[in-house]
Regions:
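Extended, loop-rich substrate-binding clefts of extracytoplasmic carbohydrate-active enzymes
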Residues: 201-270
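Polysaccharide-binding surfaces and accessory modules of carbohydrate-active proteins
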Residues: 293-368
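Beta-strand-rich recognition/accessory modules
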Residues: 134-146, 338-457, 534-552, 556-558
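Extracellular glycan-associated modules
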Residues: 1-118
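Acidic (Asp/Glu-rich), glycine- and aromatic
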Residues: 266-310
């Protein structure tokens, strides 16, 4: 009107899955009046005459020009896009005159659809609810029809790990770019980030790979004793440019993450960054919570959202109730308790996400202390990821209208292994019903594992403990004889036994008879085994549900009267 664009914006937010009647009226001398369900919700005064658009299409539910989303944090790394209305539009009327409030009220009386929702609640898909058989399976998780229809995938796009002792899951879903999530029994999603680096075009990370063009997941092992899942991705920006491309080879930064997951809800994250500059500035961990539409960070997190602990059992809990925790220094780092290496997120759930790194890796922790929006949430809150397809490097969430995420912290710790072209780091992670201080025995058993002593050592090699698998490594130089093998785990308070795994290489295709301190498990719950094919033969994987600070004897013999598997 009058050669200028005008707009009226309401302060009222529309709730999800409810019908609203929206009317916009323009009248010279009055200007714009915006009505929501018959009530004035916004105005813009103007005396100018209305000027209809010429030579332009009439669009309903879509903007006519591309623009960056409102709330964009880094415009240089965010593309301009068309914005669409996500919902149902019905009974659209365009008048050639200004209508008054009485006419709007009459219309509402005649056509009021009521409060019944015709749209289903959108929940992040995590597979079957509740307890399931421990194991991993391929599937294509369903979110909602319009979102699912965008994908060029068939029936085996995602991976879900189920547990039989608690109702949690471990999920690799394309809607999160396959970034794996621990999902609690009541549907709270948590992840430990990925590797991330930066350039003048923005963040390079799998979060940018909205279509999963380089992010892939596959099941490596799947047996009653453990699950191994391999996730591989390139470090991409939002325009699918890979970081640090070598001018000679054409290779950029790639990452392999291998997750070894056990029935007790504990997994090892072994993450290897391959690069021609393997020690550039990079992140390897961030405590991230993911929410579905209708959820806010406050719905899934306690205000006292994070507890850190050290190997002495000292703990400290950090609160966001009054803003960034006051314990954070000028750079965001926290120093209580001293030498903390255990990280527990206080989700509103019985089982909570945890992280453990070795105390010998010199860990340091910081609080995510920027991009907060006081008055919107006490926690950082963004919705440029997950499930969004547009290239966007960061967008503040203003409302819970779509899937979103929040972050609490970062861990910085030393590498477990380095080569001229790679860096590997390790962490324990999973879900637990325990407090942070009560995770110390688990941390000790992994960081300072009990010594394994062979009792029957003929044709047997003891290859020690591999923290990247949370497993002892034994190799047979000959096929197992009738006497099998026997060993001791020498647990003590400094090196306790906690649900050990034993890998017996070259065991062969023979069902084992396993005894712990002379007792055989009759339930199949406390002693589990599986097999793994390898280049050298068939390996046996044994997992024992056992906590002890004393010596434990384990024997593994070929079962009599039972055929090979």
């Amino acid at each position: 009107a009058g050669g200028e664009w005008m707009e009226a914006v309401s302060d009222e937010r529309l709730s999800l899955r409810e019908w609203y009647h929206i009317a916009g009226v323009y009248e010279p001398g009055t200007g714009i009046t915006l009505y929501i369900n018959g009530k004035s919700a916004g105005t813009y005064e103007s005396d100018a005459d209305f000027e209809p658009a010429e030579s332009a299409d009439l669009l309903i539910g879509r903007h006519s020009i591309k623009a960056r989303p409102s709330g964009t944090l880094r415009p240089h790394a965010t593309a301009e896009i068309y914005t669409f209305f996500d919902g149902i539009v019905d009974e659209v009327y365009i008048m050639d005159r200004a209508v008054d409030k009485a006419e709007i009220d009459d219309y509402l009386t005649e056509f009021n659809p009521g409060s019944k929702s015709v749209l289903k609640e959108r929940k992040l898909p995590a597979g079957r609810d509740g307890y399931g058989k421990f194991g991993a399976y391929y599937t294509s998780l369903k979110y909602y029809d319009a979102w699912d229809a965008q994908w060029r995938v068939d029936d085996h796009a995602d991976v879900v790990v189920n547990f039989d002792d608690f109702p949690g899951r471990f999920v690799f879903w394309r809607g999160t770019s396959y970034i794996p999530h621990w999902v609690t029994g009541n549907g709270i999603w948590y992840n430990n980030e990925f590797t991330e680096t930066w350039s003048e075009t923005g963040c390079h990370e799998p979060m940018s790979d909205k279509r999963c063009q380089s992010s892939h997941v596959r099941i490596i092992e799947n047996n009653p004793a453990r699950i191994v899942v391999h996730w591989r991705y390139a470090l991409l920006d939002n325009y699918y440019k890979i970081s640090r491309v070598d001018s000679l080879t054409g290779w950029g930064d790639w990452c392999d993450e291998v997750y070894t997951i056990y029935p007790d809800g504990v997994g090892v994250r072994s993450v290897t960054l391959y690069s021609n500059q393997p020690k550039p500035p990079a992140e390897w961990h961030e405590g991230i919570l993911v929410m579905g539409p209708g959820q806010r960070p406050e719905d899934i997190l306690e205000p006292e959202a994070l507890t850190l602990a050290n190997m002495n059992g000292d703990t400290h809990t950090f609160s966001w109730e009054h803003g960034i925790p006051s314990e954070a220094d000028g750079d965001g780092f926290v120093h209580v308790p001293q030498e903390a290496n255990i990280h527990l997120v206080n989700t509103k759930s019985a089982w909570k996400p945890f992280v453990i790194v070795s105390p010998e890796s010199d860990p340091a922790w910081d609080i995510y202390s920027h991009e907060l929006q006081p008055g919107v949430s006490i926690f950082p809150w963004w919705n440029h990821w997950p499930t969004a397809m547009n290239p966007c490097d960061g967008r503040n969430a203003q409302h819970s209208d779509r899937a979103s995420h929040s972050s609490l912290s970062h861990c910085f710790w030393n590498a477990w292994r380095e080569t001229p072209g790679s860096v590997t780091k390790l962490m324990l992670n999973g879900l637990t019903p325990l407090s942070a201080g009560d995770l110390v025995p688990l941390a000790k058993s992994w960081s300072f594992p009990p010594k394994l002593t062979l009792v029957k050592n003929e044709s047997v090699e003891n290859n020690g403990y591999d923290p990247s698998e949370r497993a002892y490594q034994i190799a047979l130089t000959e096929k197992p004889s009738g006497s099998g093998l026997e060993f001791l785990l020498n647990g003590d308070p400094g090196s306790p036994i906690n649900n050990p795994c034993i890998v017996v290489r070259n065991w062969g295709d023979v069902v084992p008879d396993i005894k712990v301190d002379g007792e055989k498990d009759q339930t199949g719950k406390t002693t589990r085994f599986g097999f793994r094919n390898s280049e050298s033969g068939v390996d046996l994987i044994v997992w024992v549900k056992k906590d002890a600070e004393t010596e434990v004897q384990i024997s593994i013999e070929p079962a009599t009267g039972i055929a090979s598997r």
